[in-house]
Amino acid sequence: MGQPGQQSSHEQSNMLAAVCSISFVNLWHSKAKTYAVWCVRVVKQEEPVENTGDSQLGSPRNSNLYLVSYELLLSEKNMLPDEQLNFTSTGGDILNFMRWEMALRAKHPVISLLSRHCGNMEAVFSLQLNGIMIKGATLQTVARPPLRQACFAYMWCHAKASADEGGQHLVLDSLEATIKTKLGTYTYSNNTGEADPPSTKVARRQDQVKILDIFEPCDYVLNLGGSDVTVKLIDVPFDCLVVNDECRWNLGLNVFFSALYKKIYGGIYGFKPLFFIAEPSDLTFPTSPFFSSFPNISIEYSPNFKDFSKTMSQSSLAAILTTGDCYKVNNFLLECITGISVPPIPEALRHGTGISWPLGATELNNKLIMGDLPYVHIKHPHVLYIINFKFNTRFCCGSLSGDEIPKLLARYSTGHLKQNLNSWYSYLVFSVMNFCNLHNLQWIAFNHSMFYLASHAQDQVSTPPVAAVPFKTTNTCI
């Protein structure tokens, strides 16, 4: 492939595009000012249309990567975690930095808008560009199918490790990786424990694609505080990298990208991306590691490449959700993950619901409980109706199923979002109870979004206004 070129930030244009990934690059300090820089990868629906200005380059590269910058306020700099972070590591300090950076995203008018629709290929933006810098974004109100579909690459990665003599640390025994792209296939196998993947050691065929053909370093020039700053980022021949599901817990992907980071940035001491990984702490949800900066690409996980839905999500953001939300970013993260925006419930509905139920409540009908055990007994012949309500999300939520989304919202939402969710859930419970009264049904129990209703077997019950699956039985014990 050709030599990496440079992208300048001095040509004004407009472009229609969907956003496939947003990642942090780094902080830049200059003349007592601090700038945050984000990397935005897009799926172009129309090529940029030049307005005014001139480019510093005669033939700029056709990249899908653009940048957004933001000058920090003093209050935001004061909130920056003051620990001396190792910018190629993991841990609690890194998690605090990631959440602080997410608070910046939530405040930035462009990044916050793009983040809420990132991964949704049906959300097309009109982007106002100044070279490689995104200066403004407007969501197109007329929905239409994308003109260009996202391009996917596939990676299988596996590592084996064993404990050291002291049993305190893991030592890498082997690392294997295969990446299939439209450029060709890259294969790496290392049984020596070394993590650096230079192409001369891994090539099984002379014509095999090299790792830097797939992750191609390219210099980008942006203007920060009146000075031109160069940053090396990677161009890739895909919009999303799909990796095997075991990389959620296997350390292979972390080791591979750590080695690639050192290969590209080992000799660079200036402005460059960070290498931060947040491992999921809440194992009750099928979430994945979150790479907040390098490799600055969208990563999805799939147990079977053939059955992969070819959709993108932001479910990996769940790795940085915490119950102690000191940076007030949980609600922003949840909206990015689920695509759910919850408005306040109208006053008339809120006052008519009666009892308030928290989202995800579990309740049994006390009138049907016999004895001290929490069991409901129905002795007469009846028809059991199970109604399951699902959240109407704007786009795919990745590994999170429809049943897990309300549980995630119930656990991590705060403030007005939690209040609105609880109000709407209370109204849902009230509506189901009211429906039971109108149609001679008896409510048995509800658990999260599942409602269990019963009627006498001889009763004729009209079709509920929601999907119900009847199960006929003569004696039901829940």
From Swiss-Prot:
One of its GO terms (molecular function) is helicase activity. GO terms for biological process: viral genome replication. Disulfide bonds: none annotated. Keywords: ATP-binding, Helicase, Hydrolase, Nucleotide-binding. Belongs to the herpesviridae BBLF2 family. This is Uncharacterized gene 40 protein. It comes from Alcelaphine herpesvirus 1 (strain C500) (AlHV-1). The lineage of its organism: Viruses, Duplodnaviria, Heunggongvirae, Peploviricota, Herviviricetes. The gene is 40.
